[in-house]
Amino acid sequence: MSEKKRKISFTISCVSDFAKKNRISEKESFCYLFQYKGIEFLKEHYDVEHTLSHDTVLEDLEILCRRNGGNI
């Protein structure tokens, strides 16, 4: 699998897990993460984030999004 496909797969997985954790739809999850820079964060920090547990990644996303004005 190419690096690009791995990054896409990881991002999709994170969006899905974030949706489940917060009891929102995957579309709402993506829109929220996009608006509050979570998607950008995953792209920029993939090299580190993909080595962490999904729980840790979700915590990182929650912290980042709150710092950028999110409230989930």
Please tell me what each predicted stretch does:
Residues M1-I72:
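C-terminal alpha-helical interaction appendages
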